[in-house]
Amino acid sequence: MTYPVIRELPPEMRPRERMLKEGAGSLTEIDLLAIMLRTGTSKVSVLELAAELFSHFKDLRALSQATIEELSQIKGVGPVKAVQVKAALELGRRLAAMPAETRVIIRCPEDVCGLVMEDLRDLDREHFLALLLNTKNQVLARETISIGTLNSSVVHPRELFKVAIRRSAASMILVHNHPSGDPTPSREDIVLTKRLIEAGEIIGIDVLDHIIIGDNKFTSLKSKGLI
């Protein structure tokens, strides 16, 4: 198979540009390796060079086990490119060797309260947070979406779901504090929550609940039947 020279490809078809636009998951192994190699030679495009490496070593595992000397023997690679490839593969190996992170599982509103109460109960301004969850209701991240005033916070669906998409969240639980200490939801709280639930349904990220934190007490809008 013949691969084109990168500069001859339309911008939207080039590996680096595609990765910036669509993410690494959209690229083939040859595309990713071409990005690592950066350039080809005067006779071979970087995509052809990447394909030649995979052809020689058969698969990613064999490529990762190759020594710098073995990589350097491929025409067009050389020691500099061999080191670049080996360094990137070593990072991947170390990541795979890391112990699995122990993540908190959210089973009920009390679990949420236990995570955020001490941080939010005494704040003098409203902080709007999202707990981003995976498909097993494990917490992937806790993100502060906005910081408002004494009695209000402005939350744009765009900003909320941009964070959730970036973290590959399957669902989320919304949290914000009432500096007054009273966790009773306002009409605005309920309207905003319903709006965010609707946005989540369109995007495919479920908003499971909205917890309001007061002074050592909280309200779950879902438990109260308000959403």
Curated annotation (Swiss-Prot):
Keywords: Hydrolase, Metal-binding, Metalloprotease, Protease, Zinc. It comes from the Bacteria. SUPFAM superfamilies: JAB1/MPN domain, RuvA domain 2-like. NCBIfam families: PRK00024.1, radc. GO terms for biological process: proteolysis. This is UPF0758 protein Dred_2549. A motif (JAMM motif) lies at residues 176-189. It holds the Pfam family UPF0758_N. Zn(2+) binds at residues 176, 178, 189. Belongs to the UPF0758 family. InterPro entries: MPN, RadC_JAB, RuvA_2-like, UPF0758, UPF0758_CS, UPF0758_N. GO terms for molecular function: metal ion binding; metallopeptidase activity. Residues 105-227 form the MPN domain.
